[in-house]
């Protein structure tokens, strides 16, 4: 157990999950673990606090991370997430991870050649039928996502795709409601995205669907289609699960390998959001979207879709 892990334990990243007490190391979503900062800690704290204030106030933030090293970005990220946990109180347990930038074109736009990850907190995950304020974030969006659940710690030693699959116990429809946070004209790069926990805000979680632990399970994961419609049934976006690094199991492998390289092991019960299946749908002012229905085809053997819904409440007008 390295020094970095002991430091993280000291800042309170112990988490409690339904399956039992679990400790997770928070670390930078890049290939190597980083040591904690000392000389620039106060400055990175100021950046994290400012970004957190924009996040909680729902007001778009400027880019504050230009010129920061990867180590400094890591410190901003951890401080930002620590404040999210504190703000959430009893509902602030870390329950899993969110993978971002699973599309090579999106990676290139942000200047990297790999995905990124952030943390999912319990209070971010909502049931289908939930209602949120229309302005639930600084720059609210929606996208069809896909989630899997870790069923066995064997995932950390799994070699083949089938071994990875066998360590998962469910695939879960997940309508993510991310927050882009930064000002519309901001030049967002990978560091800026990592600093704000890769934009995690809310998501609508469906019921877990069992996965077959053979080739049919891999085929099932590879052939999921997601369609987003607005509350009036009008088409918004669609996509298929091969958008996730070519196959969802590749996104699982990338996250597992990245975490393991940083001394972190996945635990049974961890929820893994694997990335964008559809394109982003803007929910910002003027979009006129009062609700979204996400229809998942191919999750189950029947042709019937698995559907998720969320509605958005208009702000009260001053009289």
Predicted regions and their residues:
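Bacterial N-terminal signal peptides that target proteins for export
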Residues: 1-11
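Bacterial N-terminal signal peptides
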Residues: 9-20
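Boundary at the C-terminal end of the N-terminal hydrophobic targeting segment
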Residues: 23-27
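Catalytic-core "active-site belt" of small-molecule-metabolizing enzymes
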Residues: 34-247, 284-285, 303-309
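Short, surface-exposed secondary-structure edge patches
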Residues: 73, 262-264
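Charged, cofactor-coupling segments
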Residues: 144, 285-319
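Conserved metal-binding segment of the jelly-roll/cupin
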Residues: 266-279
């Amino acid at each position: 157990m390295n020094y970095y892990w002991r430091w993280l334990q000291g800042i309170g990243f112990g988490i409690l999950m339904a399956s039992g007490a679990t400790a997770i190391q928070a670390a930078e979503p890049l290939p190597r673990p980083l040591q904690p900062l000392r000389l620039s800690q106060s400055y990175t704290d100021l950046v994290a606090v400012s970004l957190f204030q924009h996040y909680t106030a729902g007001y778009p933030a400027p880019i504050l991370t230009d010129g920061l090293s990867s180590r400094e970005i890591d410190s901003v990220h951890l401080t930002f997430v620590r404040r999210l946990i504190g703000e959430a109180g009893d509902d602030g347990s870390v329950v899993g991870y969110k993978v971002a930038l699973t599309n090579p074109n999106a990676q290139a736009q942000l200047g990297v050649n790999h995905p990124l990850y952030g943390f999912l907190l319990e209070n971010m995950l909502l049931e289908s039928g939930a209602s949120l304020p229309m302005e639930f974030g600084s720059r609210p969006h929606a996208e069809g996502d896909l989630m899997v659940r870790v069923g066995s710690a064997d995932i950390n030693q799994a070699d083949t795709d089938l071994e990875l699959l066998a360590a998962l116990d469910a695939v879960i429809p997940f309508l993510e409601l991310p927050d882009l946070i930064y000002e519309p004209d901001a030049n967002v790069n990978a560091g800026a995205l990592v600093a704000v926990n890769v934009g995690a805000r809310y998501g609508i979680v469906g019921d877990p669907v069992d996965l077959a632990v053979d080739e049919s399970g891999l085929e099932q994961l590879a052939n999921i289609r997601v369609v987003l419609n607005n509350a009036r049934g009008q088409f918004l976006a669609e996509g298929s699960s091969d958008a996730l690094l070519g196959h969802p199991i590749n996104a699982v492998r990338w996250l597992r390998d990245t975490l393991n390289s940083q001394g972190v092991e996945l635990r049974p019960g961890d929820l893994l959001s694997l990335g964008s299946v559809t394109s982003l749908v803007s929910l910002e002012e003027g979009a006129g979207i009062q609700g979204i229905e996400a229809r998942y085809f191919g999750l189950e053997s029947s042709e019937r879709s698995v559907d998720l819904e969320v509605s958005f409440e208009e702000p009260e007008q001053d009289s």
